[in-house]
């Protein structure tokens, strides 16, 4: 619910209402919301209670700056270690099988599967842990703004290019492609945010 785009940014999560909706005890709801607050997905304020986090342009840039640093370092470890990433290959194969009607959530899930596979292949516990800490906020960006993900063929082609670069083993080319890929994603997300703010102004 938090990451599927059904809640508007800033929506209040009233304990009584959501406990009933989800069929869980209120203390379970409180424990779950605290976990999501710690992950940056929810925020608690004195007057408004628990709300879905609202990301601004600075948040997006900050999240993707950390994401880029982690993924580029993971790429270095993968290429210099000559590691194989079958899960990334599988994600690209699934991308290739998508039609134009694929849901944004399907595209986002494959996108994250690809990038998560790269992180996992680096075989670094600390990179993995750091990436896990920001992954929920990456997904929140995508859920709230959703640009680009309605063009599955374009997203598939980008990830195919990234995979081919990794397999070719040219570190500089691959790093540059990943930086461009994530830089374009940051720009798409911030543009979508600006467009949304203009509509609601």
Residue ranges and their predicted role:
Residues 2, 78, 99, 122, ...:
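Hydrophobic residues in alpha-helical segments
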């Amino acid at each position: 619910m938090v990451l599927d785009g059904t809640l508007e940014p800033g929506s209040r999560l009233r304990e009584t209402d959501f406990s009933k909706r989800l069929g869980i005890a209120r203390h379970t709801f409180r424990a779950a919301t605290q976990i999501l607050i710690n992950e940056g997905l929810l925020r608690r304020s004195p007057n408004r209670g628990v709300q879905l986090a609202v990301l601004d342009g600075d948040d997006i840039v900050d999240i993707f700056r950390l994401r880029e640093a982690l993924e580029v370092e993971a790429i270095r470890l993968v290429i210099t270690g000559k590691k194989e990433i079958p899960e990334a290959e599988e994600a690209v194969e699934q991308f290739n099988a998508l039609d134009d009607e694929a849901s944004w959530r399907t595209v986002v899930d494959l996108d994250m599967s690809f990038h998560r596979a790269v992180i996992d292949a680096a075989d670094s516990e600390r990179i993995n842990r750091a990436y896990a800490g920001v992954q929920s906020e990456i997904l929140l960006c995508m859920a709230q703004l959703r640009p680009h993900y309605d063009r599955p063929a374009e997203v598939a082609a980008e990830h195919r290019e990234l995979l081919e670069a990794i397999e070719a083993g040219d570190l500089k080319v691959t790093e540059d492609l990943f930086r461009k890929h994530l830089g374009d994603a940051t720009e798409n997300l911030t543009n979508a945010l600006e467009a949304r703010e203009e509509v609601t102004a």
